[in-house]
Amino acid sequence: MKIALTHRSALEALSVLAARSDVGNFPRTSLPAGFVSNAGAAQIERLQRAYGLREPIQTLSCAAASRRGRGTLERHRFNPVSMAQGFIELEPAVFASSPELCFIQLCNELDIVDAIRLLGWMA
């Protein structure tokens, strides 16, 4: 399974991660070259339980053809090269946007509490 969580889904996963440990202990990374998300339904359900993700799960899609999603997925198209060091690897092959990238992705829809939480992680 390979998946990159973005937007609200990444923020939810980072919140769970922060409750378990220090998000700062997780180094920033870039997505592997040629990264394509290939998580199946059972794997997505496991991530929902593990990280408290609400539907739709927001993920990165590098190719237009792979943007077609299941009802539980909302895919966002990005050029990962422009987001070097913009991800945190939560577990092998499961990435989430870094707090800084989450802030950029969500700045128009964050409430004040989530904005402050993100700013705290970025400090």
Language-model features, listed with the residues they occupy:
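Short gly/ser-rich loop at a beta-strand->alpha-helix junction or flexible surface loop bordering the NTP-binding
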Residues: M1-A123
